[in-house]
Amino acid sequence: MVMKKFILAQCLMLLCFAASAFQQKEVNVWSSAMNKDVLVTVITPDSYNASQSYPVVYILHGFSDNHLKWTERGVVGALVDQYNVLAVMPDGGFSSWYFDSPVMPEYKYETFVSSELIEYMDSHYSTVKDRKGRAITGNSMGGHGAMYNAIRHQDVFGSVGCLSGGVDIRPFPENWDIKKRLGTIEENPENWEKNTIINMTHLLTPGSLNIAIDCGQGDFFYEVNCNLHKKLLEEKIPHEFTSRPGYHNWDYWMNAIKYQFLFFCDRF
């Protein structure tokens, strides 16, 4: 009886792999701006063929995580197969916040994400080499990073998502190493004012970016996300804002990322 259950479990596992046969690869991408290799996880669909061009979804991880975090539960790979796109997850460092840091010249993660990584993917994979075929999203620090890079590089990205993102960092001057990247808020207030998402909406041309924001109602970033939503409404910037019961955790994000992929792929 035990052996039969074991064989059944193995068969079910094989069926799962057969149904979702995406390919996952870890690559080193050289950053001239930072003079180092950056680890990047690339997932291609089972149907990947160099004769076809594929849209790309870039996914940025949160504080203290790395390029592998989004792959741990298999959801992203299944979405890649479902929508026939590529997913790219760069290592954003322990706490880069995806800035080109004004106080730490060796931290140039904006340049890496919005320039060097794009160039690498477009030259090494069969991608849609146009902003309309690129989306970027992320969770927490990565949600901030996605919005930050997309707003500042609307010529590069056509769609942006934000999952529980730190879209206003000013209420959190002592948290998550932000002051290491911008300097303290007391000594460098301008760095904090101009590098927080809620103060960057004037850079948006209405309709220039497809924007999808998602944050749980029990999240400590919920209030700042609601404030950004209200400001975008006031400035008549089209966007989708989703608010559901949930917290700042992977249970929420693993569900929310499915809707982000649907949002992006409807617009590719």
Give the predicted meaning of each segment.
Residues 21-268:
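Non-catalytic cap/lid and distal C-terminal segments of serine-dependent acyl enzymes
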Residues 1-6:
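Positively charged n-region of N-terminal signal peptides that target proteins for export
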Residues 12-20:
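Hydrophobic h-region of N-terminal signal peptides that target proteins for export
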